Amino acid sequence: MSCNFTVNKYNDIHEIRIKGKARKDWEQWVLLTSDRHWDNPKSDRLLQTEHLKLAKERNAIIIDNGDLLCVMQGKYDPRGSKSGIRPEHNVDHYLDKVIDDAANYFAPYGENFAFLVVGNHEASVSKRCETNISQRFADQLKLKCPASQIHVGGITGYIRLRFDIDTTHCSYLID
């Protein structure tokens, strides 16, 4: 089942336009997450997988509000600690490995991803390593799941959910 939404950007507002039918049983699920820190050894991947599978089953739109990745163990991060690295990520090209593994992990749910906010962890890496971790992840996810419409936003901004139900339109702003 494909997701029935599109994502567009207007200045600092990302709009998720959802199409539906005026039926008594119509509903749209949204999985709203933040601070997954997916690559951290303490991250609860079993719970994340459970939520992602449920989102796919419900045809939910996935919005991640930042810190999808921890990525604090890089060379230039003063908060880093080698004990905070999963064994499979303890390699020379640490950031590349985390991005590739994350894209593989989230690819089965890529079609449901609408929006990814840059969290303070990703922003710190961008500042110190001169690379946009969030955009690199989104690009890799799109390569693995071409149907993904994932958009990357900044640390601040707005998300508007616009519902197009037959000829009726209504919207809700998330700020």
Where is each model-derived feature located?
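Short, solvent-exposed coil/turn segments
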Residues: 9, 25-27, 169
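Short glycine- and acidic-rich boundary segments immediately preceding or forming the N-terminal edge
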Residues: 1-22
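Residue-identity detector for threonine
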Residues: 6, 33, 49, 131, ...
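Core catalytic region of metal-dependent phosphoesterases/phosphodiesterases
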Residues: 17-29, 33, 38-151
